[in-house]
Curated annotation (Swiss-Prot):
PROSITE patterns: ANK_REP_REGION, ANK_REPEAT. GO terms for biological process: cellular response to prostaglandin D stimulus; protein retention in ER lumen; protein targeting to membrane; regulation of anoikis. Its main location: endoplasmic reticulum. The modification Phosphoserine is found at residue 411. This is Ankyrin repeat domain-containing protein 13C. Residues 1-20 have a biased composition (Basic and acidic residues). Acts as a molecular chaperone for G protein-coupled receptors, regulating their biogenesis and exit from the ER. One of its GO terms (cellular component) is endoplasmic reticulum membrane. Keywords: ANK repeat, Chaperone, Endoplasmic reticulum, Membrane, Phosphoprotein, Repeat. The gene is ANKRD13C. It is found in: Endoplasmic reticulum membrane. Pfam families: Ank_2 (PF12796), ANKRD13_C (PF11904). Residues 1-27 are annotated as: Disordered. ANK repeats lie at residues 111-142, 143-172, 176-205. It comes from Homo sapiens (Human).
């Protein structure tokens, strides 16, 4: 088939209507930069603020296929904090019989029965301890809540700790886009927030270990190559674009080893940090030794660890309790792709070279970013302080200039006792569940996301293979956004140039400049002899 015929077949390509929402709400414990919330950096050596380079459960928009059932979705592929896991280790056969059965009478629908949810709602710990052995504790009710959601929102600590002891999923979101951790932050019990945060990170580590064999097998089957791509960040916030960075990344892949060279260290506080950084993944090493970051300017290296100290966890809890709770959903229900046009008098489909590859350009239509921000747990002082810091950052300031010291937050006074009955809750119309917990203070906004994507049939790497590579380098937050975005059903070809949302106010244009199959000296995947280990070079790894 000729190139012209191929291009004609791609016009007005539309994805299947069955896709639904491909983007789940971003981690609500994150604070989206300039999107109305703020994530403070931890304090490192000498009392200076340090930056979250790899913590993906901050500033995150999560993109994945909508679940086909009410059960929580499967775990996304993320090497650090933001991977979710399945509800528990029970067998599929056991869970198959636990779906609720709706009872219909008089031509109307009666509420489905959720026994685990009911005993959590009523605080029946004894019955819960019995049901927990035979039921799916990660199941969602008709409002999208899991039993853990209800336990946290109602302040039923015993039920919550029992569910966590049986590995109830912490990352799963309800119909409003909130996870149990978000609801715990709203409720304000410090002990519960800490327990959920620790369980979230434990489940993330377990998810990484579970995916490792499949990932190594995929890398081994993929040829050795060199890939170069360019990042250019933009924002519609006045004065912000001038301080946003760009970056040229080089990826080397050999066997089950990957090296990524980058000049962009971080920009989560809106102050671009430049450097000469190399990220090395050694698939032959033990999991605890697999990930290494080299600072090529200072000639030091640090291994990425997953365990956090007690102090680090406590500081993170302080940050969560003093920041807005944020959730963002990129709705793709109405998404479509139409061919971009060029020319003034005689319009024709736009086809241009991107790097070395001929590509067809498409307009991405129907992409809507829906964001929610909650602050019922914050004092007026918290809100004013956060606003002042955000205003400074939007003008090019830096967190370190704020002399920020995290304040040890105490538990909040619990909200008034719940007066809603189980029957009232479960029989409420879907999407209109009576609110449980602290009275909401929530602001919602919607923004249409306009994007362009260039697809090439000439690019030698397939999207599935790219996803395996991006899964390895996902500790870099912006690479994780790219991995999530390309999981959408795209027009034919490989996305050699595309616009992706990174934060609610920031987009990135990613361009694949060069690709070639190649062989490399194995030494580039090892730590140079003259480099010294510095475990505190990147305090947030």
């Amino acid at each position: 088939m000729t190139g012209e015929k191929i291009r004609s077949l791609r016009r007005d390509h539309k994805p299947s209507k069955e896709e639904g929402d491909l983007l789940e709400p971003g981690d609500e414990e994150a604070a989206a930069a300039l999107g109305g919330t703020f994530t403070r950096s931890r304090i490192g050596k000498g009392g200076k603020a340090c930056h979250k380079i790899f913590s993906n459960h901050h500033h995150r928009l999560q993109l994945k296929a909508a679940p086909a059932s009410s059960n929580p979705p499967g775990a996304p592929a993320l090497p650090l904090h933001n991977s979710s896991v399945t509800a528990n280790s029970q067998s599929p056969a056991l869970l198959a019989g636990t779906n609720p059965v709706a009872v219909v009478a008089d031509g109307g629908s009666c509420p489905a029965h959720y026994p685990v949810h009911e005993c959590v709602f009523k605080g029946d710990v004894r019955r819960l301890s019995s049901l927990i052995r035979t039921h799916n504790i990660g199941q969602k009710d008709n409002h999208g809540n899991t039993p853990l959601h209800l336990a946290v929102m109602l302040g039923n600590k015993e039920c919550a700790h029992l569910l966590l002891a049986h590995n109830a999923p912490v990352k799963v979101k309800n119909a409003q886009g909130w996870s149990p951790l978000a609801e715990a932050i709203s409720y304000g019990d410090r002990q519960m927030i800490t327990a959920l945060l620790r369980k979230l990170k434990q489940q993330s580590r377990e998810s990484v270990e579970e995916k490792r064999p499949r990932l190594l097998k995929a890398l081994k089957e993929l040829g050795d190559f060199y890939l170069e791509l360019h990042w250019d960040f933009q924002s519609w916030v006045p004065l912000l674009s001038r301080i946003l960075p760009s970056d040229a990344c080089k990826i080397y892949k050999q066997g089950i080893n990957i090296r990524l060279d980058t000049t962009l260290i971080d920009f989560t506080d809106m102050k671009c940090q430049r450097g000469d950084l190399s990220f090395i993944f050694n698939g032959d090493a033990a999991p605890s030794e697999s990930f290494v970051v080299l600072d090529n300017e200072q000639k030091v290296y640090q291994r990425i660890h997953h365990e956090e100290s007690e102090m680090e966890t406590e500081e993170e809890v302080d940050i969560l309790m003093s920041s807005d709770i944020y959730s963002a959903t990129l709705s793709t229900k109405s998404i479509s792709f139409t061919r971009a046009q060029t020319g003034w008098l005689f319009r024709e489909d736009k086809t241009e070279r991107v790097g070395n590859f001929l590509a067809d350009f498409y307009l991405v239509n129907g992409l809507v970013l829906e964001s929610r921000k909650r602050r019922e747990h914050l004092s007026e002082e918290d809100i004013l302080r956060n606003k002042a810091i955000m205003e400074s950052l939007s003008k090019g300031g830096n967190i370190m200039e704020q002399n920020f010291e995290p304040i040890r937050r105490q538990s909040l006074t619990p909200p008034p006792q719940n007066t809603i009955t189980w029957e009232e809750y479960i029989s409420a119309e879907n999407g209109k569940a009576p609110h449980l917990g602290r009275e909401l203070v929530c602001k919602e906004s919607k923004k249409t996301f306009k994007a362009t994507i260039a697809m090439s049939q000439e690019f030698p790497l397939g999207i599935e293979l790219l996803l395996n590579v991006l899964e390895v380098v996902a500790p870099f937050k912006h690479f994780n956004k790219l991995r999530e975005f390309v999981q959408m059903k795209l027009p034919p070809g490989f996305p050699v140039k595309l616009d992706i949302p990174v934060f609610p106010t920031i987009t990135a244009t990613v361009t694949f400049q060069e690709f070639r199959y190649d062989e490399f000296d194995g030494s580039i995947f090892t730590i140079p002899d003259d480099y010294k280990e510095d475990p505190s070079r990147f305090p947030d790894l």
